[in-house]
């Protein structure tokens, strides 16, 4: 419970202008992009420094008040939903890039810098931050840390964890630590940095981030490859890698995903034909155009072994931007059309055809339609289960059964239930599908060491039986 005394203490720390108790503001900060769920905190604070956050956490720790870190609210797993009320701690004022280190190819940034803003800032110095989530124009770097975000270029360049060198973190008791060192190598003790990445705000609050950068890449070639059968598109993915090509992006989109999105963003009809069940969007990048064209031709020779239609080589910036606009707006297009649930399955890429066929069969069994797309190059398939004309009873009763079977199928294919969206609130009850009791217990013991009073984003990641 937030008493008037506690509220006054929070005001003393951040100032009255940055403490909010009105219903409208609390509701706005009590939702992200997860379905239509709203869980507002009891009070919202907007600190401006690690020191202010430390002072807030000391109060929360003393009075055992839940604290939910809040970023850009673009998440898809309910990670910022304050299901136990308490303090909503918005990081939006920690929004500065502190240093771009051109000598060491590093950047030091605060957590509320928008991912695309950081990418553009380092690009001006001839550097490259590859992590490329679809929400890069609005999501925060801190949120990328919390979820271990990936995106289209993860297939070649890796995900967030591959670029995080060091983190400043405020612990649940208010202590401030650095998790590692600003070095490419570190074999000194347990890796606290990597433990924090993907921890979804359950272990501490990240207040400063040191990221590795790469030299900028100068050129890319983009192919739009239509397939008559969606399982053929899925099968072509591993064949491209087997031929010795590692694309910088390899995206799968089934027909409905493209059709809905083309209307949503007004993409010309030339990119879609009625007889095509799915497309692959394949990019190769590098500094030598001649080599890229050789790689593109090799990809073409691979996919010609499958049932494909005419391939488009996107050779202008307008074409490339339009195709990426199409891909990046699928989730929003689905959201505009119907109520939906989005799952984030990931399997070894060779198993993609089995996963795709299985998902469609499960949908038929339980009476729901799914729209599939995703980062096929790393086996990550987003499954949008859409309500359309399903009854409310069927939506509430049949869909959860189908989701459970989809996750069981994913596990049987040596995959897991989230590739980049995280577990948060909406997936936590499915964790026993992929982890044994022993494995879950080990993870929960780590949580308890960091957070003995269970105040740090409680009710997330672990099944309900663990949150006590």
Task: Name what the model sees in each region.
Residues 1-33, 62-65, 302-318, 412-417, ...:
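N-terminal accessory segments
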Residues 375, 416-423, 458-459:
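Short acidic/histidine-rich active-site segments
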